[in-house]
């Protein structure tokens, strides 16, 4: 630069003065956020809040061209020091995606946030307690004897056990999702949000419609519920306002009344683990069919596009009936899963 009679200090000052707002990290991040149209509104809002709370205060005003791995490492370490391990982990993903967006927009040539794995301690995987299957008779007895709250609450707990869907999938359910004729519950990818109720637009966890075949027992429970709430849009309306859903802690609160510690013994989400365990131990069902019914995330992105279709549906219909029959068989005394229903379900 000196050979060209250019003052390096003045040149750097001129370059700083010519920075366009579009190249500042915050604006690049907001453009990336705006470009993602597949997110639900809840996801978009939550992510934007995370950007505003944890990322923008640290590097928001820096040009993306000046960002180095050290900026991202220090940012993540700062979040980790606050004890926010899950936030730190998600921040790493967001940073990499945002800087990749900058590369795609030809603002920079490489992604300095691409290889940040291992910088922070991984978050501890959340453990949802579940009873051993040997305690099913006790659980069923306690559910049947539950009369301390609304009858609707007892039905909610029992139905959740039979269909083993996620809490929000149950709590925000509408009667329009139930097909009594074909005995199918189709949980949509998203739902019409309820004004004033956080996350009420949530549908199926994987953001694709999830098919839940309904056993004879599940249909019977739903008909009992329909006698109570059939005139409402929501299957499980709240106690005080029929236009809003039951409280998110309703099922777990009922389990605590039944005498269970929902942090150590069993929680509503733990029903999923119990069902999965029994289905696999039975030896009757292919692992892939069980995974489809559990609505677990598909790691193969090509196959993910087909999850919403009725994959393994016939097997899943039989599977859900087997699970309900298995619960009935365990009302009096425990029976190992592999001893129930082989002749009925296997040709």
Regions found by a protein language model. Give the residues of each.
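Conserved tyrosine-mediated DNA breakage-rejoining catalytic core shared by Y-recombinases
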Residues: 114-118, 129, 172-224, 298
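Catalytic-site neighborhood detector that most strongly recognizes the C-terminal catalytic loop/helix
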Residues: 122, 130, 187-194, 219, ...
